[in-house]
């Protein structure tokens, strides 16, 4: 690779004693974006359960069952705390019940039955005894939960038992989706990601077309995905006889399974999402990193009239599009963000058209894209300038009383608060100074005794978001809270390897299940380490 093939950003700084060579780690991360063009995301308990149930013919079946058995919590459930556990617990309980009913389950029957019974016991407590924690705003939960409960009730009904639906759910939306699919009509692309909820209507549904994967690296167009989802792909293929090995959707499933060793993520490929987030976090922190020109060209090529989806099989969305545009601008490849106007509503920008709900982080990312574009545009751009004013006001109005933001795409308020605070700091003007100060005060007030930050416990990811807020904003006093930064840096340094890889990386991002996008999170952590190393008065502090 020649010098002309690279775009170098940032200025080099030599690491001191005890520090991580962040620039070297960033180079390795960027190389991984090229080497793994589908992206890297954590395995999903929910999605893996669906493959156990829907595709016992798929290679790696026994490994998937073992993955699920090992992940059961002491209380009988699966997944993260609070209401996040409902969907994975339903998925695994149904999957292992289906495994028990097979003639040759391949596992010790009494042990498997005990695992299922513990899962059912917790589900009865949640759903029939009304002890279910409040449910988070997760994609398709209003379809997934009724579908899985109906399947489990099919087993329980033989003994005169059943599980109730969560409060506020009646299954009407699920019935409508299934009826539409059965009619042969096309369905919105965002629903295809959760096609498995449709049951028999999903099998070879005429209104659903596989999406070829062939635009990145050497990937073959003979590989195709259904909604970028292994579960959706398995549902479309059906649970009967195994399809031909060369069938494009089966090729996709086999490729994912082979890459992960059995268990599967909720979504793959996530090419544009991963690259946009990772590169923008690295660049915003000022890390010196060489970005191959081909990577930049791929991001440019991904942007069409409607923007870009996170990956093949998913709908285009304002979040992926705005982050890609922002990353490109930071890398010197400025594009007019006019495709984002498609997502403008009367008050804000939606993730996709027809969205039920609203997202502060999506609007913060649109503000980043518009604001960075205005820094480069040679003349007046009144429409963009007016949108920046509206977005900053909208974000300020959605700040919580204590100074944080919450969002529908991440479990942690530290992610949402970092996105919104940094956008307002950079592009919100003087009118946003108070909102930024309130966010900083909230971050300082919620630091844990060990120097970390986190919703349920301290994590490297959430600590990194907090450090970005403290180090990339200017307090009203003009001073930075360096004692909090020092404590946060000590925690972060002790939580990662010498290459800046977190020892523990819990999934905190919202999809059908919580997931971890590896490269974006690692980029955020590297950015925080780099900023802290530059700000602390003594190397190694």
Question: What spans do the regions from the language model cover?
Answer:
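Short Pro/Gly-enriched beta-strand edge/turn motifs at strand-loop
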Residues: 32-34, 214-220, 506-507
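An alpha-helical repeat/solenoid feature that recognizes helix-turn-helix modules
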Residues: 1-21, 36-63, 80-110, 125-193, ...
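Edge strands and adjacent loops of beta-rich recognition modules
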Residues: 192-217
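Helix-turn-helix repeat elements of alpha-solenoid scaffolds
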Residues: 22-27, 335, 343
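Buried hydrophobic core positions in alpha-solenoid tandem helical repeats
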Residues: 29-33, 68, 119, 123, ...
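Nucleic acid-processing catalytic cores of prokaryotic defense/repair systems
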Residues: 73-78
